[in-house]
């Protein structure tokens, strides 16, 4: 976060040390709880698909969805996956190849599959399960129980109607969301700045980074000010089309046959090691990899959850519980799998052949 607001790599040691110590503390003493919570949300979300409540509609039996499947999926994709996926779709699998402590020397087949699997773990099912479970709770509380459209409504009508307590809870949720937004904004600014520097030789100065932040903020404000239908929906449609075009270009003009073969193998490797990877706490290892990657990602998803889940609930009126969970949990995760598989394997192919 701090990097985006500093010039020429100069950073505040005090702030860096504070956040590093906080992250280490959370990883050491609460890492197990974060992992259990993430897995718990996934199990709970899948369970909801098969319960007797699966056909309950958000908004009542006569509720009709406001948005088509295409627009709904486009807004889901744009809400939960931003600029980070563009960068980490290529960079993360490569970084795992060299940093993950469980890699086997000389076994590129295992290592590459593991690297892609870890990237899918960080961006796929578990994160979307958090959004799915909380988003469903928001939607049900608002549309079926007529509670206010706030985070505090998750705790029931007694809390929602207790104004001081409800306001306190909502403020905590806002602060949590701010941390999530600033993390994304900081990472995104760094990526855009580095990209502009590489393509058109614009220097990565503090003023240029602040200008990038200003432009991103203005685009966001414009989209929100135009409303859900005229702003966010259309921006999501444009975002989805551009993502599909970029994905198709890399697939068709990259190592296509290699990517297709790798996708099949990646699926098997991901399914085979999902439980092991999702419950690994690094307790017997001396490295800090888990702290820097999986726990960081899970915490990031949790930080974004109040904001994104409210938005998902807002656009999901009229969907059944089963429809909601499948759409929110599995469709974006499938997009992530294809994205990581195509971009990540294209990058790995380049590494192997160099």
Language-model features, listed with the residues they occupy:
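Helix-loop-helix module between adjacent transmembrane segments
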Residues: 1-2, 8, 42-47, 82-85, ...
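N-terminal alpha-helical transmembrane segments of multi-pass membrane transport
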Residues: 1-111, 225, 248, 252
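Extracellular/periplasmic helix-exit of transmembrane alpha-helices
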Residues: 6, 88-102, 250-273, 333, ...
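Hydrophobic alpha-helical transmembrane segments
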Residues: 31-39, 112-135, 209-215, 281-305
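Membrane-water interface regions at transmembrane-helix termini and the short interhelical loops
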Residues: 18-27, 45-66, 114-122, 137-147, ...
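Juxtamembrane inter-helical linkers in multi-pass membrane proteins
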Residues: 61-64, 101-110, 148-166, 264-285, ...
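Alpha-helical transmembrane segments and their helix-start/interface "positive-inside/aromatic belt" motifs
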Residues: 30-36, 64-85, 124, 164-174, ...
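Selective recognition of specific alpha-helical transmembrane segments in multi-pass small-molecule
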Residues: 75-84, 130-132, 173-182, 211-225, ...
């Amino acid at each position: 976060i701090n990097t985006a607001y500093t010039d020429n790599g100069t950073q505040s040691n005090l702030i860096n040390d504070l956040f590093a110590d906080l992250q280490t503390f959370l990883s050491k003493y609460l890492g197990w709880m974060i992992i259990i919570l993430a897995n718990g949300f996934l199990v709970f979300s899948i369970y909801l698909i098969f319960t007797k409540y699966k056909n309950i509609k958000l908004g009542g039996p006569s509720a009709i969805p406001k948005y088509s499947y295409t627009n709904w999926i486009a807004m889901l994709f744009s809400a939960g996956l931003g600029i980070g996926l563009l960068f980490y779709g290529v960079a993360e699998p490569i970084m795992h190849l060299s940093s993950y402590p469980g890699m086997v020397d000389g076994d590129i087949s295992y290592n590459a599959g593991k690297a892609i699997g870890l990237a899918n773990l960080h961006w796929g099912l578990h994160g979307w399960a958090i959004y799915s479970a909380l988003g469903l709770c928001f939607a049900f509380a608002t549309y079926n129980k007529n509670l206010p459209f706030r985070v505090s409504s998750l705790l029931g009508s007694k809390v929602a109607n207790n104004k001081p307590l409800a306001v306190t809870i909502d403020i905590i949720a806002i602060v949590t969301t701010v941390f999530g937004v600033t993390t994304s904004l900081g990472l995104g600014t760094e990526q855009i700045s580095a990209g502009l520097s590489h393509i058109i030789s614009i220097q990565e100065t503090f003023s240029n980074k602040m200008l990038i932040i200003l432009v991103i903020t203005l685009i966001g404000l414009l989209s929100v000010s135009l409303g859900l239908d005229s702003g966010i929906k259309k921006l999501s449609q444009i975002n989805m089309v551009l993502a599909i075009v970029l994905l198709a270009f890399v697939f068709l003009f990259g190592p296509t046959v290699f990517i297709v073969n790798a996708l099949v193998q990646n699926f098997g490797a991901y399914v085979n090691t999902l439980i092991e990877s999702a419950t690994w706490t690094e307790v017997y290892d001396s490295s800090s990899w888990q702290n820097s990657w999986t726990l960081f990602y899970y915490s990031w998803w949790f930080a974004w959850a109040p904001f994104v889940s409210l938005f998902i609930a807002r656009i999901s009126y009229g969907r059944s519980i089963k429809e909601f969970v499948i759409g929110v949990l599995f469709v974006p995760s499938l997009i992530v799998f294809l994205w990581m598989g195509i971009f990540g394997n294209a990058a790995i192919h380049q590494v192997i052949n160099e």
